[in-house]
UniProtKB/Swiss-Prot annotation:
Coiled coil (residue ranges): none
Name of the protein: Beta-lactamase
Pfam families reported in the protein's UniProt record: Beta-lactamase
UniProt-listed Gene3D superfamilies: DD-peptidase/beta-lactamase superfamily
Subcellular location: Periplasm
Length: 381
């Protein structure tokens, strides 16, 4: 009898730990505030907007100023520059193009840009561009490259440091070119394709590449060394770092990416899943199309340390996953993003139906963003 009682007690303990009581909105707010308020003070961030997706439902929180000079507060409608979180939109749009049969990741880059006649481009595929494994394309396209002719010259003159697929080196010039070439045969501009194929179907009505005049009042200023700034235009900027969005739209973006089964357009649904497929393994991290994934559960150190620029921007050996592994629900899926005056972070765990969006109008170190997100989600799981 004693043995049976102990077994029952153990089962009850396991049950309670597995099925913890659901958090109230106030409890969620307290957890978020206890992390974000000191973060803003430590990093001198003028304004932030955070969304929590908890049990599939979004909760929104805002702090501080979107425009210091005019004393405009951050609201749920405030537009923030996403920086490299824009790459996740690029990846999903590319996935939609693949699902439609309009491109293949195995296609050579030269199929879509025949003017690239340099021998170094032989053997480089769209997959290599999308996943930063072409052989060492640089982080940025030089600022003096200002038109299409100069862009072609830049890529023609580039010389790889490694064979395609040997190493991953994070680069706007890599995934940016993927985005541009992925839509080339559609007859649409990248912005038009993004709007029609991704933003409109997902009802992201406040997500922009070019912020229209009617939305300028909601466009936050970013702050760099205390001065207000907006991102400067550049070649392939839309594809690599050019999206602006609100916390409400970004929560909707996370919800769609966390569970694509509710997305009505089948090719977009497949595109979302393709963006979270695993194409390469780099240490503990798996590279998708825009998104980066780690197996869940995991230790905080692995994502916090991995987000540091010394690691994230380093050339690291890449191990091909062939065939690519489909999206894994037990994953920490995430992406950081920065422009001169903004810092963003998005992370979610599909298996837990749990996610976070952090938007700030100051760029601050990635590890601080990831650690804050981890602290919050750890208390909510």
């Amino acid at each position: 009898m004693m043995k049976k009682s102990i077994c029952c007690a153990l089962l009850l303990t396991a049950s309670f730990s597995t099925f913890a009581a659901a958090k109230t909105e106030q409890q969620i707010a307290d957890i978020v505030n206890r992390t974000i308020t000191p973060l803003m003070q430590e990093q001198a961030i003028p304004g932030m907007a955070v969304a929590i997706i908890y049990e599939g439902k979004p909760y929104y929180f805002t702090w501080g100023k979107a425009d210091i000079a005019n004393n405009h507060p951050v609201t749920q409608q405030t537009l923030f520059e996403l920086g490299s979180v824009s790459k996740t939109f690029n990846g999903v749009l590319g996935g939609d193009r693949i699902a439609r049969g309009e491109i293949k990741l195995s296609d050579p880059v030269t199929k879509y840009w025949p003017e690239l006649t340099g021998k170094q481009w032989r053997g480089i595929s769209l997959l290599h561009l999308a996943t930063y494994t072409a052989g060492g394309l640089p982080l940025q396209i030089p600022g003096d490259v200002t038109d299409k002719a100069e862009l072609l010259r830049f890529y023609q003159n580039w010389q790889p440091q490694w064979t395609p697929g040997a190493k991953r080196l994070y680069a706007n010039s890599s995934i940016g070119l993927f985005g541009a070439l992925a839509v080339k045969s559609s007859g649409m501009s990248y912005e038009e394709a993004m709007t029609r194929r991704v933003l409109q179907p997902l009802k992201l009505a406040h997500t922009w590449i070019t912020v229209p005049q009617s939305e300028q009042k909601n466009y936050a200023w970013g702050y760099l060394e205390g001065k207000p700034v907006h991102v400067s235009p550049g070649q392939l900027d839309a594809e690599a770092y050019g999206v602006k969005s609100s916390v409400i739209d970004m929560a909707r973006w996370v919800q769609a990416n966390m569970d694509a089964s509710h997305v009505q357009e089948k090719t977009l649904q497949q595109g979302i899943e393709l963006a979270q497929s695993r194409y390469w393994r780099i240490g503990d991290m798996y590279q998708g199309l825009g998104w980066e994934m780690l197996n869940w559960p995991l230790k905080a150190d692995s994502i916090i340390n991995g987000s540091d620029s010394k690691v994230a921007l380093a050339a690291l050996p890449a191990v091909e996953v062939n065939p690519p592994a489909p999206a894994v629900k037990a994953s920490w899926v995430h992406k950081t993003g920065s422009t001169g005056g903004f810092g963003s972070y998005v992370a979610f765990v599909p298996e837990k139906n749990l996610g976070i969006v952090m938007l700030a109008n100051k760029s601050y170190p990635n590890p601080a963003r990831v650690e804050a997100a981890w602290r919050i989600l750890e208390k909510l799981q």
